[in-house]
Amino acid sequence: GASAKEIYEECTRLTNKVEASFILDRLDYMHKGGRCSAITMMGANVLHLKPCIEVMGGKMAPTKKYRGRFRQVLLNYVEDRLAGRDDVDPYRIFITHTECDPADVQAVEELLLQHELPFAEILETDAGSTVTSHCGPNTLGILFLRK
């Protein structure tokens, strides 16, 4: 076994290699938490805009907007996150979500199984309290390590 100091150092080293991002189906919870205006929320919901939120330096920031039905947006998002990348560690990838339709989660998993990156493990997890409280239900993300 490793010492507490060794575990801490390894966790700190890996923190800089983590990529975490999410797609939100609706902006209701972002609005309720004061993270977007009512106009932004209504416009996004009416136009079926689904923002991608990336976790960078411990903070969440919007990076890209997708438009359309949630399942197709999820598939486009996964392709965008992984396309043409040679720095993704193919050992393990997480599908993390907040109360998503199991069929949507399954569609993402099937896409990852067919992807050019041969992931050794695809793990499905429930999102933590921070993502859940900020983003609300029907939020899905993929998390992985860079090499």
Give the positions of each predicted feature:
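Mixed-charge interfacial surface used for oligomerization/domain docking
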Residues: 1-147
